[in-house]
Design a protein with these regions (language model features):
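Acidic (Asp/Glu-rich) sequence patches and key acidic residues
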Residues: 1-150
Length: 150
């Protein structure tokens, strides 16, 4: 099952270098592949998290399509841009998508919509979620090791 996040904003970053700088300002251990121009993002975006290969699907979406696809969601205002993040069940993909989305939202003055929860998060809330994910990773890894032993 794929999960999705969306960054809603009124501005866009101009380059992958600009996005990476936003990630670096948050001191996230995430490196995005900078070969694809940010304006051409569509599909899987390779990344490295703490030196391990990972990534997530990422692309620009029309605002109208995004809003129309969520009739029960209420947004406090109209936004100009939507950047979509999608990943499967891999925990590194989850963590890297949240880090990348939080940094992008902060750099563009945007917010994050979590499709699973049907909830909009401020940048501050998104940064807390990233910290929660980072704190839970050792427990998740231990649980997965225990499952493999059984």
């Amino acid at each position: 099952m794929a999960m999705e996040l969306f960054v809603l904003s009124d501005t866009q970053l101009n380059s992958m270098d600009e996005w990476q700088a936003a990630i670096d300002r948050e001191r996230f251990p995430l490196r995005l592949n900078s070969e694809t121009p940010i304006s051409a993002l569509k599909g899987f975006l390779p990344a490295s998290l703490r030196g391990n290969a990972t990534g997530f699907e990422c692309g620009h979406s029309p605002v109208e399509v995004f809003v129309r696809g969520r009739p029960r969601a209420s947004f406090d205002r109209a936004w100009r841009y939507v950047l979509t993040f999608r990943w499967g069940g891999d925990f590194r993909e989850l963590e890297s998508a949240w880090m990348a989305a939080a940094a992008y939202a902060k750099a563009t003055g945007g917010v994050i919509f979590d499709d699973e929860e049907g909830k909009t998060h401020t940048v501050a809330e998104a940064l807390e979620i990233v910290q929660d994910i980072e704190r839970s990773m050792p427990k998740v890894k231990e649980l997965l090791r225990d499952i493999k032993r059984v």
